[in-house]
């Protein structure tokens, strides 16, 4: 998905950049990830983004806590979709932290899925491996 790009666009190109520009913790705050995802699921992503702004202006949240809440809110739609469509499937989460950690954590905690994190060194090759597997399956189908 484009959630990582959406997150960066919001964090760096909106009024939220005041406390989020350049913030990129290796491991997000788990409680704030859950709170952001829950807020977006219950009230929508726009209200969750507004809540980040309110907390930025009137609360003592750290930049890392705001980052985590925002990340949870932005990833919520992907988590909800996989909750509906991912039952019974093996879910491997690649990429780099903090997104990899956040996705896997939210899939386990919010969606009840057994998501596994792929080490960054391995996930670098996951797209090529996946493309190869698709090509092999298509070739097999074509040849009967």
Predicted regions mapped to residue ranges:
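Generic structural signal for well-ordered, non-membrane alpha-helical segments
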Residues: 3, 42, 64, 68-72, ...
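Structural alpha-beta junctions
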Residues: 108-118
């Amino acid at each position: 998905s484009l959630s990582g790009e959406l997150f960066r666009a919001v964090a760096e190109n909106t009024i939220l950049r005041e406390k989020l520009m350049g913030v990129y913790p290796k491991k997000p705050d788990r409680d704030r990830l859950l709170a952001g995802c829950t807020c977006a699921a219950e009230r929508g992503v726009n209200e969750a983004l507004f809540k980040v702004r309110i907390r930025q202006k009137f609360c003592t949240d750290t930049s890392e806590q705001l980052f985590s809440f925002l990340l949870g809110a932005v990833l919520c739609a992907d988590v909800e979709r996989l909750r509906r469509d991912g039952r019974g499937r093996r879910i491997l989460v690649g990429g780099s932290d903090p997104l990899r950690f956040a996705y896997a954590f939210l899939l386990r905690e919010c969606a009840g899925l057994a998501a596994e994190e792929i080490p960054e060194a391995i996930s670098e090759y996951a797209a090529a491996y996946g493309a190869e597997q698709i090509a092999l399956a298509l070739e097999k189908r074509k040849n009967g």
